[in-house]
Amino acid sequence: MYPKKELAQIVISACSQFKIETVVISPGSRNAPLTIGFSNHNKIETLSVVDERCAAFFALGIAQQTQKPVAILCTSGSALLNYYPAIAEAFYSNIPLVVISADRPKHLIDIGDGQTIRQENVFENHILFSANLIENEKYKTRNSQLIGEALQIAVSQNGPVHINVPFDEPLYETVEELTTFSFPHISLSSLDNSNIDYEKLGNIWNSAEKKMILVGVNYPDAELHQLMDLYAADTSVLIFTETTSNLHHDKAIDSIDQLIFSLTDAEFKKLKPDVLITFGGMIVSKRIKRFLRDYQPKHHWDIDARKATNTFFCLSEFIQTKPVDFFSHFNQFITPLQSDYQSKWLTFRDERRVKHAAYLKNIKYSDFSVFEQALASIPDNCQLQISNSSIIRYAQLFSIKNSVNIFCNRGTSGIDGSTSTAIGAAFANKKQTVFITGDLSFFYDSNGLWNSNIPANFRIIIVNNSGGGIFKIIPGPGTTNATKYFTTPHCLTAEHLSKMHQFEYQKAYSTETVAKELEGFFETSKKPKILEIFTPSAENDLILKTYFKQIQ
């Protein structure tokens, strides 16, 4: 059974031909023709999520793991606007998301008809392409071209696209067969390594005594990992890897803030690189950003397949290619240089690690101690999803097992869809997925649990410090008389939500109970699990601030 409407058939046929394998559908009437068609297509998996914001982040989590476009489908009106947070995240995180919205015909917009808004180009500031279709036989070729271009861009450029599909009534008429349509191939410019002057870059690199490579959000890549081994062998190269980089090396600095906190001006000058190479997504560490803005390298090269990012206001070279392609070609033009740059700072790193371990031995029960316990307990070869705000910042202070793949919504750094993203990732990746989140982030996206596709091996660890802990850590909020509006203190727990959504629920409130509850937490179960850990909100910030003083 398929929709009788030809425009709906064109959209469905295009998605099938462009290998869109998954469509997340939110209920509505105006999108009925597409819902009927997608749900009856034998090569397209359809998933139902009611809340559009949760649906979009759920789809984003699937696309994050599969590295393939995932479509989301909704009805007309404000339903579409609920997609925006996930679209912005996809835009800045280079995740392919195909947004398909049903709409009223143009003659019904802005005349007082129900459930209508101005949907055309509504995401124009955060979308790679917008296809505004017209339901009319004479526009069939135009519609096919726009749909084909949108899907091809989503596939080739890894980002969100929007297809707006207006339907007039009737909406529920069906036919038995789906017509196959042809879609013209749109010629898109491809990445061309021949345009990169490797010889010039090699000369600059080879003459520099201090080279730094800084890696942001990055999908696990075995080939890139091997290439980094070659650069780590050069004693004039210092590699900084964020928690979300999924790159591990014993000669890399993986806890950036731990190293550079409270360095003196003289030490910062010694750390300042001559050449800086950056690749990957957004950088979490504010301290490394501040350092590289205050002590700018002479040469900053940013590598990205799509867009340049001048994070430190000193970009000298945008290298538009994939990092793995750049480093594999660049190897032929570089020569290792003897320098004490790497060894000096690795020694410094090791000294900080010793102080880190010593501090943790005597630490009071707190967010900090909970992170040590939780991160150490995560099983090998699983996937770790981390929410934003203080949670990702605590995680950055620890070395996490190399076999664990780590993800976080750092495109826009919002707390709004972390739970739904983690659920989508857990659905797509059959590895056990562990999601560590703060209380505000969890409750903000608690509707994400209203999803029938959550696997039984999914685990959530909530660090509940009764409010926004980040606002006690960062300078500023504590100096005002409006603290409650920043930290938003509360007495909520996840216990009743867990029962309502069929999760097993556990709780802990001390070092001993955390250890006890973690013992069997990751074992096979029939239901997903939540472990809620309550920490003392009054002491967490002091313990963290004391930590940075102790490791100096």
Describe each PLM feature range.
Residues M1-P3, L292-S390, H496, Q506-Q552:
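Phosphate/pyrophosphate-binding active-site segments
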Residues N121, P160, V165-N195, L518-Q552:
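Glycine/aspartate-rich loop-and-adjacent alpha/beta segment that forms the canonical ThDP
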Residues I100, H107-I117, Y394-Q552:
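Thiamine diphosphate
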Residues S101-A150, T241-F348, S452, I474-P475:
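Glycine-rich, acidic loop regions that bind phosphate or pyrophosphate groups
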Residues E21-V24, E45-L47, Q65-R104, K272-G280, ...:
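A short, small-residue-rich loop immediately preceding and capping a beta-strand
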Residues A8-S13, S26-R30, L34-T35, L346-K430:
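Active-site diphosphate/adenylate-binding microenvironment
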Residues Y2-N82, A88:
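N-terminal cofactor/phosphate-binding cores enriched in small/glycine residues
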Residues N82, V215-W301, K401-N429, F443-N447, ...:
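Glycine-rich, anion-gripping cofactor-binding loops and their flanking helix/strand elements
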